[in-house]
Amino acid sequence: AMKMSFELEIGAQAPLGFWDPLGLLADADQERFERLRYVEVKHGRIAMLAIAGHLTQQNARLPGMLSNSANLSFADMPNGVAALSKIPPGGLAQIFGFIGFLELAVMKNVEGSFPGDFTLGGNPFASSWDAMSEETQESKRAIELNNGRAAQMGILALMVHEELNNKPYVINDLLGASYNFN
């Protein structure tokens, strides 16, 4: 495989430019780069959903029961990492089974497209996406990539602070805004 240069790829932009401190792409070809970019985009999307879910669950809960057999209501579920310890084993198996199904059967990258294109030939926003200039599409992809990177750091920070002192919302502490977490 021929050694490639990735300084001009989407996401290699100010202020860091191309940043690969672990050298994951030191001897990589375009195929390896695209595989790692695919993984980065997917993890970024999951992290953006995780941040939204963490903040939503902190302020609102669904009515009703999560598990009748375990006598567990949605209101009884803790937020954050602690929720994993309350989900019944059968529920965890369902969650991981569904994730596995999505990973193996549904969320496939469109061949010949950019990493992270999961349109599967049925993108409901295709007409608006296709109407954008190539420059605008690249800008949107760079924005998504950077928001995903920020969300990955954000959800990691929430989990670390939750484990350190059960106070994940550092900004509330800095501003003196009280909150109850779990």
UniProtKB/Swiss-Prot annotation:
Transit peptide keyword on record: yes
Compartments, record wording: Plastid, Chloroplast thylakoid membrane
GO biological process terms, semicolon-separated: photosynthesis, light harvesting
Family label: Belongs to the fucoxanthin chlorophyll protein family.
Pfam families in the cross-refs: Chloroa_b-bind
Chain's role: The light-harvesting complex (LHC) functions as a light receptor, it captures and delivers excitation energy to photosystems with which it is closely associated. Energy is transferred from the carotenoid and chlorophyll C (or B) to chlorophyll A and the photosynthetic reaction centers where it is used to synthesize ATP and reducing power.
Any one GO CC term of the record: chloroplast thylakoid membrane
Coiled coil: none
Keyword vocabulary terms for this entry: Chlorophyll, Chloroplast, Chromophore, Light-harvesting polypeptide, Membrane, Photosynthesis, Photosystem II, Plastid, Thylakoid, Transit peptide, Transmembrane, Transmembrane helix
Name of the protein in its database record: Fucoxanthin-chlorophyll a-c binding protein D, chloroplastic
